[in-house]
Amino acid sequence: MGLLIGDDLWAVVIFTAIFLLLVDLVHRHKFWTAHYPPGPVPLPGLGNLLQVDFENMPYSLYKLRSRYGDVFSLQIAWKPVVVINGLKAVRELLVTYGEDTADRPLLPIYNHLGYGNKSKGVVLAPYGPEWREQRRFSVSTLRDFGVGKKSLEQWVTEEAGHLCDTFAKEAEHPFNPSILLSKAVSNVIASLVYARRFEYEDPFFNRMLKTLKESFGEDTGFMAEVLNAIPILLQIPGLPGKVFPKLNSFIALVDKMLIEHKKSWDPAQPPRDMTDAFLAEMQKAKGNPESSFNDENLRLVVIDLFMAGMVTTSTTLSWALLLMILHPDVQRRVHEEIDEVIGQVRRPEMADQARMPFTNAVIHEVQRFADIVPTNIPHMTSRDIKFQGFLIPKGTTLIPNLSSVLKDETVWEKPLRFHPEHFLDAQGNFVKHEAFMPFSAGRRACLGEPLARMELFLFFTCLLQRFSFSVLAGRPRPSTHGVYALPVTPQPYQLCAVAR
């Protein structure tokens, strides 16, 4: 068979183009109804891929919301997406319509990152029996190993002591606190998953954290969106390895830790940690093809805990110290409250939180202002729903825009400024706020929220009890514009720490 040339080649090109346009037209036809949310006109085949800045999604969605309203649509290649904005709409979606919107969209890239038919972890698992099984296991096991109890609080307090000692060694010169914060929070997760802590100088520990940090954004950027929208590209030999090198390296490191841990597991003894508890469930489930307890899922549950439990908390603490050096008046008031309630002799305890309204307000405001997971993790409709006057078909990807809630101008007095008074009443008492949802809401709310709250309070108060933090003299003030990824991190900065 000869090569196509001349008119024959052009005929094939034109036919292919017309075919793709017809496929695109048929695919989006059901969404072109009077009751489907409005949005920018998609390009054939590409949809709105070129109209959304995936390196700064919050700003792109902010501009689109100002034009199309609180509920608007996008099309990413052939994938329909609806974005929900504002407190009222987001809460209604996640809570009132929680049963119908708790599913996850199919993200083909994760099939090349260890996900399979019976191995989807917890965070990205479809809403169904396997997700319920793994979430129930995770919640109950976290509780069994101390979340919400004095035993884990003591572990966190001990780790906070190690962190403060390391800060004291670094205090002779300016330093970036982010990596030390990551090590401290990672050791809390390691205590739950592996029943051990790592020395901060441990080479394997440092390699693992460095790889994890370098992986930020690999699965959330523009290329990842293109591959999810056009998954046939993932069949190109070698491409997934080139697009996700650090994520694959981190998975390999987790596998190495799990292999070593299994060697010391004794099923006749009580479980030492979550990994032992999972292995025990695997043993019970032998011969049950429907069980989600398997080696592949063990790896993903552990990765979920590191990603959701370590990365978010350490990033929030990094934001907290940045905001303290930029707002010395706020830092001074935190110092005063710590001195009054706790003093300088004993370590902070969770029982102190109720008597420290200003410190509690500061921590909440850090979470609101930092806004580290602005677009949430995508949801998906499991049936057709009528929402806010629109018809959203089954199988539509949903983006609950948490940033639009945490920065809602109709709710917060100073939405774009760091203002701890958002969480204080006129008498200085701490007040909860329904628009405070950094952990999301509804059925997919973060299962590690109780642990995160404990860590944030204990690490933050321990550090502020022992140190005063400041910007470097004669240097430009650090920026509060974050680096967009999952999570949103502060731009690299340094601080000075002085023992109190």
From Swiss-Prot:
Transmembrane segments: none
Factors inducing expression: P450 can be induced to high levels in liver and other tissues by various foreign compounds, including drugs, pesticides, and carcinogens.
Enzyme Commission number(s): 1.14.14.1
Catalysis performed (reactions): an organic molecule + reduced [NADPH--hemoprotein reductase] + O2 = an alcohol + oxidized [NADPH--hemoprotein reductase] + H2O + H(+)
Record-level GO BP terms: arachidonate metabolic process; female pregnancy; response to genistein; response to xenobiotic stimulus; xenobiotic metabolic process
Membrane topology field: Peripheral membrane protein
Keyword S-adenosyl-L-methionine: no
Cellular component annotations (GO), alphabetically ordered: cytoplasm; endoplasmic reticulum membrane; intracellular membrane-bounded organelle
Residues that, per the record, bind heme: C446
Enzyme class: oxidoreductase
Keyword NAD: no
Listed Pfam families: p450
Superkingdom: Eukaryota
Keywords: Endoplasmic reticulum, Heme, Iron, Membrane, Metal-binding, Microsome, Monooxygenase, Oxidoreductase, Phosphoprotein
UniProt-recorded Gene Ontology molecular function terms: heme binding; iron ion binding; monooxygenase activity; oxidoreductase activity, acting on paired donors, with incorporation or reduction of molecular oxygen, reduced flavin or flavoprotein as one donor, and incorporation of one atom of oxygen
Modified residues (Phosphoserine): S249
Subcellular location: Endoplasmic reticulum membrane; Microsome membrane
Cofactors: heme
Family: Belongs to the cytochrome P450 family.
Function: Cytochromes P450 are a group of heme-thiolate monooxygenases. In liver microsomes, this enzyme is involved in an NADPH-dependent electron transport pathway. It oxidizes a variety of structurally unrelated compounds, including steroids, fatty acids, and xenobiotics.
Protein name, UniProt field: Cytochrome P450 2D26
Source species: Rattus norvegicus (Rat)
